[in-house]
Amino acid sequence: MKMFIVLVLSAAFALPAAFATEQDVITLQAYEELLKNGAANGMTKTVISSPVLEEALVSYSKNKLGGLPVCGETCVGGTCNTPGCSCSWPVCTRNSLESTKSANPLLEEALTAFAKKGLGGLPVCGETCVGGTCNTPGCTCSWPVCTRNALETQKPNHLLEEALVAFAKKGNLGGLPVCGETCVGGTCNTPGCSCSWPVCTRNALAM
């Protein structure tokens, strides 16, 4: 009987650790399922440190915002040692998730929504809409060109939005978006914003 109790207690204490590890290494497919089901909103910030998200953000940065963050090493010998980096001579840059991210329209459109809101404009879809119609999926007419804006509904996903903000804060996108209010009195009323005097900026994931 004592042996049975010890085994049950051991299993109970082992479960949380195993679950935490599983969250840390969440796969792209599992993350996509969470987003589809709306379950990602209720998860802990552990998921935000997922390399899937970070590399998707980097891929987006390369494709839409004109450059890749540097990995902190050179590749004069043709090799990069940092995981997720490859040689863009003479430096190593992050670009490991290009193909996988491209097949995830949910992430791409969420990133686009963030770009529209925080970086002052939408990426262009590569076609004009003089006739009022856009043929590219996820694009609509902002005359005279088509722009990506199909996933406005993705904005309420705080987990994604805050991960994007954390990425922006790292310096890869040139700073934090301003929240649209001042904080002369030291307080910010917009959710997810705090005072970077004299304005409020989005930094909900600083913790």
UniProtKB/Swiss-Prot annotation:
Keyword Manganese assigned to the entry: answer is: no
Question: What InterPro entries does the annotation carry?
Answer: Cyclotide, Cyclotide_moebius_CS, Cyclotide_sf
Comment, domains: The presence of a 'disulfide through disulfide knot' structurally defines this protein as a knottin.
- Gene responsible for this protein: Vok1
- What residue ranges constitute the propeptide? 21-66, 96-120, 150-174, 204-207
Q: Where is this cross-link: Cyclopeptide (Gly-Asn)?
A: 67-95, 121-149, 175-203
> What is this protein's record name?
Varv peptide A/Kalata-B1
What GO biological process, any one, is recorded here?
defense response
Q: What does this protein do?
A: Probably participates in a plant defense mechanism. Has hemolytic activity.
- The set of disulfide-linked cysteines is 71-85, 75-87, 80-92, 125-139, 129-141, 134-146, 179-193, 183-195, 188-200
User: What keywords tag this UniProt record?
Assistant: Cytolysis, Disulfide bond, Hemolysis, Knottin, Plant defense, Repeat, Signal
- Mind telling me how this protein is modified after translation? Varv peptide A and kalata-B1 are cyclic peptides.
- According to the record, the signal peptide region is 1-20
Q: Which family does it belong to?
A: Belongs to the cyclotide family. Moebius subfamily.
